[in-house]
Amino acid sequence: MNRPSFIGHYLDFLDDDDAHYPGSDELLSIGSAVGKKLGLKKIGIHIETLLPGRRTSWPHAESEEEEFGFVIEGNPDVWIDGTLHALKPGDFVAFPSGTGIAHT
C-alpha cells in the first residue's frame, strides 16, 4: 500500500548541499522546504542541517513571516543583532515579524 503524499521522512526531502546566495560561493545549511513539498500553503516548515562553520542565511529581519527554530542535536550559535548566543538540544528560538530583530 502506498503512503499518502503528505507523509514523508526527512531524509527523502533534503536538498543538495549547494545552497548559496547569488554571487556568493559561501555554502549555507543543507535544508529543504518540507512544508511546501508536503502541500502546506499557510505554514512554512523547513529542515536545516547546519554543518560546522556554516550559517542558515545572511542576517535578516522578518517583516511579514514569523520564524521559529528548534535544536534537535548539536550546539549551534544564533546571531541576533550582532551578538552570538549559544544554543543546545531542546532550545527554541522565535522571531516575530515586524520587530526588526536581525538574525541568522
Regions found by a protein language model. Give the residues of each.
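Short acidic-glycine-tyrosine-enriched beta hairpin
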Residues: 82-99
